Amino acid sequence: MDGVICDFVGRYKKLFNVNPDQTRNKKEFGNLFNQFIQGQNFATLEMMPHAGELLEFLRNAPVPTEILSSTARQDSHENISKQKEIWLNSHGITFKRNFVPGKQLKKEYAKEDTLIIDDTETVITDWRIAGGHAIWHRDVPNTLAMLKLYF
């Protein structure tokens, strides 16, 4: 979800005046991320540019589509899952939802007949190693072009 259909980075930068990648390896990120969660921000993120086009393509795809999204860690899993459910519902997105307490767990869903769209290179690498197909999302036009090669 984050970085593909909803804009976590944009909201984080707006709230804290810093890119999350600049704080991820610092104690500062944990404190700011906790504030982000407590502010219910995952429920109200802006949609990524052109995400509607991607969602429409996936709604019409000849295969089942599911959401696979990380809740960052176990202690925030329930809270972030609820916020992401609210976001999906408010945008009329009815795909089956799967939430995992850490992006490193996404690979557990990889199978030979699965395809993930994700904006994180490590997720893409892990998914492919686990046997699934993957599209490293950079923007909607490129992702749509890649999807059309599969369908």
State each model region's role:
Residues 70-114, 121-124:
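Substrate-recognition "cap/lid" segment bordering the active-site pocket of phosphatases
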